A protein has these predicted regions:
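Short, contiguous, well-structured surface segments enriched in hydrophobic/aromatic residues
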Residues: 246-251, 255-258
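Charged, low-complexity helical/coil segments in non-catalytic cytosolic or luminal regions
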Residues: 223-225, 241, 264-266
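Polybasic, proline/glycine-rich intrinsically disordered low-complexity segments
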Residues: 261-268, 301-303
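Short coil-to-beta transition motif at edge beta-strands of beta-rich domains
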Residues: 265-287
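Long, largely alpha-helical accessory region at the distal end of helicase-like NTP-driven motors
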Residues: 2-104
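C-terminal accessory/interaction regions of large nucleic acid-associated machines
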Residues: 69-221, 230, 239-248
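Short, hydrophobic/proline-enriched secondary-structure or compact coil segments at domain edges
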Residues: 217-232, 278-283
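Compact mixed alphabeta submodule
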Residues: 287-313
Length: 313
């Protein structure tokens, strides 16, 4: 057991020079072509370990196995893969990005449905991580395709991630269209785009750290839930007590200022009467073992059963 743990530790703490050396030596170990998938498989290295250091293409260039390539969009695409897509787990979303990547991101917005346009905006935020900066969403997506080496890398990464998914996504019925699926995992930014809180012109003010986000136009509130909370990430007043009681029952503690006799507290109690949708997005904890921010699993729609207390409820 100790040996296995030591091997895992060694594999996850490789430095850049060790990775580069392994890339150089790959051809001496096997007759397989050097691809990201073959490399991580042969060396028992996680894809996260690669992206803690650099993009796969840049590591290969530093190892002298591919020619140097232009740096256009490199920082943004490296960040999108390492910080966004490795925190996401969704067959439908990954397949959508894969499809446009295979067209070199050379898209025309008029070819897409409303739901697909929402996913294009999710991709925009994954890569550029901000609103605007382009005349249009179409131009923003087209720009991603300018670096051919990294487009090839995006395709390779997405195929690996799709292959790793071991669960079935399920559609959720809501009174409006949105592209997210039950059981899949998404970043906070992707969720805020899907529920129309972040637009092309303006990023939601809820993009950082608050446990709830509401869109009154579609009468929907999102609960962002961390099951394990560390005192580093939470103040004593926000260490809310959230946990599953059973497969169908969940204990959730509201924000501190929420009263049970007015305002938001009453909308929770009366949400069915008000036609308000309360959607649960849950993650184990804020970061994983690679210190990457975890995405949230779309658990589904919540239905109020009972409450006790006030401020918080």
């Amino acid at each position: 057991k100790e040996t296995i743990l030591e091997n895992i530790k060694r594999a996850t703490t490789l430095n850049v020079n060790q990775l580069i050396s392994k890339i150089r030596n790959f051809q001496h170990q096997t007759t397989l072509p050097l691809t990201l998938e073959n490399f991580i498989s042969l060396n028992h290295i996680s894809i996260e370990t690669i992206y803690k250091k650099d993009s796969w293409s840049r590591l290969c260039q530093k190892a002298g196995v591919i020619d140097d390539f232009e740096q256009i969009n490199e920082k943004q695409i490296y960040s999108a893969i390492g910080k966004k897509w490795l925190s996401t787990n969704s067959t439908s979303y990954f397949n959508f990005i894969l499809q446009i990547a295979k067209q070199n991101f050379n898209i025309r917005i008029s070819d897409f449905s409303e739901n697909e346009k929402t996913m294009l905006l999710m991709v925009h935020y994954d890569v550029w991580q901000n609103a605007g900066d382009f005349d249009s969403l179409e131009k923003s997506i087209n720009q991603i395709g300018k670096n051919k080496t990294l487009v090839k890398e995006i395709i390779e990464v997405l195929e690996i991630l799709i292959d790793k998914i071991g669960f079935k996504e399920i559609d959720i019925e809501l009174p409006y269209e949105q592209p997210l699926k039950l059981h899949a995992r998404y970043t906070r930014d992707q969720i805020l785009v899907a529920f129309r809180m972040s637009t092309f012109e303006k990023r939601s003010s809820n993009a950082i750290g608050v446990g709830v986000a509401e869109n009154k136009e579609i009468n929907t509130e999102i609960l962002f839930i961390d099951l394990i909370k560390s005192e580093e990430d939470y103040s004593p007043t926000t260490l809310y007590d959230d946990y599953a009681i059973s497969e169908t029952l969940f204990h959730w503690q509201s924000q501190n200022q929420t009263r049970d006799d007015s305002g938001k507290g009453l909308t929770y109690i009366n949400h069915k009467k008000l036609g308000k949708k309360i959607l649960l997005f849950v993650r184990e904890q804020s970061t994983n073992e690679f210190k990457n921010t975890n995405g949230y699993v779309f658990v589904g729609e919540g239905n109020f059963q009972e409450h006790e207390g006030s401020k918080p409820m």
